[in-house]
Regions:
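N-terminal loops that bind phosphate or other acidic moieties
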Residues: 1-141
Length: 141
């Protein structure tokens, strides 16, 4: 994989400062399509879950095209692909799940949804201290 990427970069000479040029010269339709999904999430204010190495690459492309796309991207898990850690670090995202997975087929995203459901339930349904009559903290003297 590494040699194929090095060869593609050498032959096609993408401009690293131009995400569209990189995508056109060394990307694939899968990466372009997923980058479009991440951009669409930003346009319509809908969060999109990033899962696995290829979607990390797609998210990186989307963020280079439109930096505010970052605000709508959730990182499901850290892929075992060594470059996945670098991409997450580069885009400033922390994955929610750290389970050493490399299963494919969107497994990390599928594992994330029950966690998101739980977080939403806590956020919307949890009682406040006032609701359950917990007194305000007072320092002991």
């Amino acid at each position: 994989k590494i040699n194929a990427i090095k060869k593609a970069i050498t032959l096609n000479k993408p401009d690293p400062e131009d995400a569209i040029d990189v995508l056109a010269k060394v990307g694939g339709l899968d990466i372009a399509g997923m980058a479009g999904v991440f951009l669409g999430g930003a346009v319509y204010g809908i969060p999109v879950v990033m899962d696995g190495f290829i979607s990390c690459v797609s998210a990186l492309i989307a963020m280079r095209i439109c930096p505010t796309a970052r605000d709508y991207i959730l990182a499901s898990h850290v892929s075992k692909e060594p470059a996945a850690h670098l991409i997450l670090e580069n885009i400033g995202k922390e994955a929610i799940i750290h389970a050493d997975m490399c299963l494919g087929e969107g497994t990390g995203a599928v594992a994330l949804f029950p966690i998101l459901d739980l977080a939403a339930a806590v956020y919307h349904s949890m009682s406040t201290f006032d609701d359950i009559h917990v007194e305000q903290y007072e320092e002991l003297k």
